[in-house]
């Protein structure tokens, strides 16, 4: 489960190393994001 302010490790070749979740889209009063949900995130650390 992912909630706002959660730091995530990135596993792709975009150059980002760490993200922080800001918002869960489509979830007005849901606290957590699950598999398949869309989240808005900011890059906290890059290559």
From Swiss-Prot:
Keywords: Chloroplast, Plastid, Ribonucleoprotein, Ribosomal protein, RNA-binding, rRNA-binding. InterPro entries: Ribosomal_uL14 (IPR000218), Ribosomal_uL14_sf (IPR036853). GO terms for molecular function: large ribosomal subunit rRNA binding; structural constituent of ribosome. It comes from the Eukaryota. One of its GO terms (cellular component) is chloroplast. The keyword Plastid applies. It is found in: Plastid, Chloroplast. The keyword RNA-binding applies. CDD domains: Ribosomal_uL14. One of its GO terms (biological process) is translation. Belongs to the universal ribosomal protein uL14 family. Part of the 50S ribosomal subunit. Binds to 23S rRNA. PANTHER family: 50S/60S RIBOSOMAL PROTEIN L14/L23 (PTHR11761), LARGE RIBOSOMAL SUBUNIT PROTEIN UL14C (PTHR11761:SF27). This is Large ribosomal subunit protein uL14c. It comes from Vigna unguiculata. The gene is rpl14.
């Amino acid at each position: 489960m992912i909630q706002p302010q959660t730091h995530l490790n990135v596993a792709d070749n975009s150059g980002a190393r760490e993200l922080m979740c800001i918002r869960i889209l489509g979830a007005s009063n849901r606290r957590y994001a699950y598999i398949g949900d869309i989240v808005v995130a900011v890059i906290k650390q890059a290559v």
